[in-house]
């Protein structure tokens, strides 16, 4: 990991993550990681909004940009804004030698390899993983991550490729997702709900469905359902919930019950052996068990596969969705 990112870790007062699209949602997960493991205040901002709101930026702050291409114009402008205020800058990028990598004080490469499809998938996984690694190392330097916790998290990370691979293999060999696509491909609206670490997974899952299948989908914090979205729930608007067994599991069960009470259909991303939730919902998108902090990385995969199968069933171009570009280089 670039030493420039870790230097001065004890003196850091604030981290601002700037990004666009899927990278922004990865940043929301990074906020949870960084605040939990480093106890540094973290803000996540759309890069396209950051420079226009006269942000409060100081030399004791770190501007952390996330951009797959390293060429996203709004993200580069946000980096420049941070530098103009004397803040240190760092970037999580995939393309080696890209503009973001060149202009920032420090860089962490995703090392995800070329991502051919316009809709980001493995770059999201790599970004979230890098954010967790940064949080672990910053936490070590600040004394907020113990040796035991570091070993626990690093050991859990070592299991991640196998778990993700098995998840994808099971999806490819079975017909669960094709059947779901057959069931739902004519629906026009979806609601995605998650809490805590899984709220960003919900909005990312909704974005994937929008991007490649052209179906309107909204991602919401589950606790906000009663503040508006609940008015939309009926037989014509399925709800996708991200509900692994974590600290907010009981809250998610309550939200599922509220959707069902209004004749809503529920698809749940949950642990495959969770018989209790299986009895509450209409369809399961199973995920494996893992460390709580790694669950978002695994939970997003069923949503990616679901969006893919929906797009295929609807005859959409998965790799080149209409009106989208891999790298947005103009405002």
Language model features with spans:
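Extended hydrophobic-aromatic, low-complexity segments
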Residues: 26-28, 43-44, 73-76, 176-179, ...
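A signal for specific C-terminal beta-sheet/loop modules enriched in small/flexible residues
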Residues: 214, 286-289
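A charged alpha-helical hairpin associated with nucleic-acid processing machineries
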Residues: 186, 222-225, 236, 261, ...
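Glycine-rich phosphate-binding loops that contact phosphosugars or nucleotide phosphates
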Residues: 10-159, 242-285, 306
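Active-site phosphate/pyrophosphate-binding segments
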Residues: 1-16, 106-238, 311-331
